[in-house]
Amino acid sequence: METCASFRLSPALLTSSTKIYDHVKSHLKSAMIQFSDLNTTPVMSIISNMGSAGIVTFQLTGAVSDTETLAEITEPLAFRNHSFGGTYLHSREFFGKEIEDILVRFYKRASTASKLPEFVETKITYNNSITETRHTSTVDSHVSPVEKYLQKCFVKAKLILSIKTCTMLQKWLRQNKNKSPVARLHINETLTVLVVTVGDECTTIEFKSFVLEPADAFLTLDKPGNFGAVLVDCTAVVNLECLIQAIGICKVPSVCVPAFKFYSGGIVEVSSAHLKQSKSPSATVSTVLLDASESLKQPAEQEQPTTSQPSDPQSSNSVDKPSPPRPSISQPVRRRAPPRAIISDSEEDSDSDSDQDCSTETQPETSYREEPKKFTPKPTAPPNKRKQFEPLKCPVEKKKKSNSNSFVSII
């Protein structure tokens, strides 16, 4: 085996960053541990996905105390925090207690022609000089750091929110989660307000504006508050669930408060703005919220086929034009035909009788279709004429009475 690179971590710096790690460790189980800037000052980062449109990065600037790398290796090296088929978590062991030394070594097989590492070994030595932990896993493919992409973008505005404002904003966002899956963030330079819109609901947050460069403003804070540096008006559409999680991740009591950075291209970064009383300034947490404006177009496209389906011409005509009197008059005619068929049909009738009944049933319909105008000029039937349709019901009622009387007589 040939060693390609080795990194020795500082247990003291990791111990001082334990409070931030405990705050975000639930989001880092399926993360990637990455070592970047190998030619200058190596930086250790723990990167993980957050929901469907967010990325969490827990970065430690001075975590690497010593390094040895080959000149051919210039790209970042990364491996999984949680190895396949096991319960070992590298980050949990790195931020443990009573640790004396941590060594991360990348190596490869001597038979392979490639100079890139294939495996990684973590070796942790504890203070008792007896206990030692070793774990070996494979190296994942190259993953470009998020910072390199953000460095190419232009920072339009940076906004700091106090812990009280963040708590109220989180509560308001949770109450309106069912209104829309996305949230629209808009900063107005003239009015110095942040407008958050979810569906038909919106809330406004006022802040104090400073004439500063947003990229380098508010690195450390004496006291948290609502203030910012804005160059131009900016708008971004982000995932609502990711926004709620991002505010909670970057809000660590007595350590840091959320800072909103608006980049060109509709990207919003919620990072941790450290307070001066913080004891871990080298550890930073940031969440990148990707542009979610396309998610608004997809539901609209799915609803178009259902709303734009052409209706039947008959139904459209019935809605546009008033219904003629023909259906209202034809109802009693159709009621008279079925009783005749019922009376004539019996188990003793022959096939010829049934044919005659079928022909008689069709006669009212044909005569009605040929002369529909005979029924239109007639006024509503008086009560005397209405009784003409009731003789058929009389024998039914008499039969019921006779049956009931006979039944009583038998008893």
Swiss-Prot record:
User: Which residue intervals are annotated with compositional bias (Acidic residues) in the record?
Assistant: 345-358
Q: Which purpose does this protein serve, as stated in its record?
A: Increases the processivity of the viral polymerase, probably by acting as a sliding clamp that prevents dissociation of the polymerase from the active template.
Give the record's family classification.
Answer: Belongs to the herpesviridae DNA polymerase accessory subunit family.
Source organism: Alcelaphine herpesvirus 1 (strain C500)
**Protein's name in the database:** DNA polymerase processivity factor
Q: Where are the transmembrane segments?
A: none
Name the source's superkingdom. Answer: Viruses
Q: Which GO terms describe its biological process?
A: DNA replication
Q: Which gene encodes it?
A: 59
UniProt key word Transit peptide: no
Q: Low complexity composition bias: which ranges? A: 304-318
| Region named Disordered | 296-411
Q: Which UniProt keywords apply?
A: DNA replication
